[in-house]
C-alpha cells in the first residue's frame, strides 16, 4: 500500500514543482490579459480547489491549470459549478473543461481527457471509536458520499467483490456535508479521495480514521466535452506530460 502512495506522490511532485515555479511571477502584464481565456469549472474540493481568505481560487488543480494553460498561451478563469451538472455545463460550452480531482476511471467514454496528471486513492473513513476496520465491516452500515463521485458508483454498482451491501448509501450535494454527517453520527462512514479527507481533518481539527484498504486507486485528469475538437485537450495532455519530465 505504501508503494501506491509513493507513486501518487511522484506523479504530483514533478508537476507541482514546475507549476509553482511558473507562478512565482504574479505580475499580470497587459500581454497576459490579452490572452484568450479558458473557463475551468470545479467545485470546492480542498486541497485541489478552494477559495483563499481573499476569495480567490487556489489549490493544487488551480496552480497546475494556471501554469499548464499559460504555457499553451491561455489565461484561466476558475468558476465554481454545481458538480452534479458538470457534464451538462461542459457540453453546452458554458465551461471549457472540468478539473477538480476528477477521476478518469469509468468515465473514459463520457469525456475527452487530458492526463492523468496525478494518482489518488479512493478510501473509506470512520470515526476513531468506530468498530469498522475493514471494507467487509461496512455490511449493513450507513455510508455517505458526495453525489456523482466515483465512490457513489463503487457502492451503487458493487462490481468489486470486496464491496459489501450497505444499509443505506446517502449521496449529498456538497463535500463538507458528508463529514458533518459522519461527525454527528448520522452515518457510520464516508468515502472520498484520501487527500480530501486529510485536508478536511486539518482544516476543521476533525479526527477520523482511514481504512487501510483503498476502494480504488484512480487517475485524475482534465475533462473536456467528448465532441470538443478544438485540439485544446490534446495540447493540454502534451503539456502535462512535459511538466512531468
Identify the role of each PLM range:
Residues 42-44, 119-126, 194, 202-240:
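Periplasmic-binding protein-like
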Residues 1-10:
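Bacterial N-terminal signal peptides that target proteins for export
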Residues 30-102, 171:
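Extracytoplasmic small-molecule ligand-binding "clamshell" domains
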Residues 74, 82, 115-165, 227-230:
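A conserved helix-loop-strand patch within extracytoplasmic ligand-binding domains
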Amino acid at each position: 500500500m505504501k508503494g501506491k502512495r509513493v507513486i501518487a506522490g511522484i506523479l504530483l511532485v514533478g508537476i507541482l514543482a514546475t507549476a509553482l515555479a511558473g507562478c512565482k511571477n504574479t505580475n499580470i502584464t497587459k500581454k497576459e490579459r490579452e490572452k484568450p481565456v479558458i473557463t475551468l469549472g470545479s467545485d470546492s474540493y480542498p486541497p485541489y480547489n478552494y477559495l483563499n481568505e481573499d476569495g480567490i481560487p487556489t489549490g493544487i488543480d488551480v496552480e497546475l491549470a494556471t501554469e499548464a494553460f499559460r504555457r499553451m498561451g491561455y489565461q484561466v478563469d476558475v468558476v465554481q459549478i454545481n458538480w452534479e451538472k458538470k457534464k451538462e455545463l461542459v457540453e453546452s460550452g458554458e465551461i471549457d473543461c472540468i478539473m477538480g480531482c476528477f477521476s478518469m476511471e469509468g468515465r473514459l467514454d463520457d469525456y475527452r481527457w487530458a492526463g492523468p496528471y496525478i494518482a489518488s486513492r479512493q478510501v473509506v473513513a470512520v470515526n476513531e471509536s468506530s468498530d469498522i476496520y475493514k471494507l467487509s465491516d461496512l455490511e449493513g452500515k450507513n455510508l455517505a458520499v458526495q453525489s456523482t463521485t466515483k465512490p457513489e458508483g463503487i457502492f451503487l454498482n458493487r462490481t468489486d467483490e470486496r464491496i459489501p451491501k450497505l444499509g443505506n448509501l446517502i449521496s449529498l450535494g456538497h463535500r463538507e456535508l458528508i463529514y458533518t454527517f459522519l461527525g454527528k453520527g448520522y452515518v457510520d462512514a464516508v468515502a472520498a479521495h484520501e487527500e480530501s479527507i486529510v485536508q478536511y481533518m486539518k482544516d476543521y481539527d476533525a479526527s477520523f480514521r482511514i481504512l487501510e484498504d483503498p476502494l480504488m486507486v484512480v487517475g485524475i485528469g482534465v475533462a473536456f466535452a467528448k465532441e470538443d475538437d478544438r485540439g485544446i485537450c490534446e495540447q493540454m495532455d502534451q503539456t502535462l506530460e512535459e511538466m512531468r519530465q
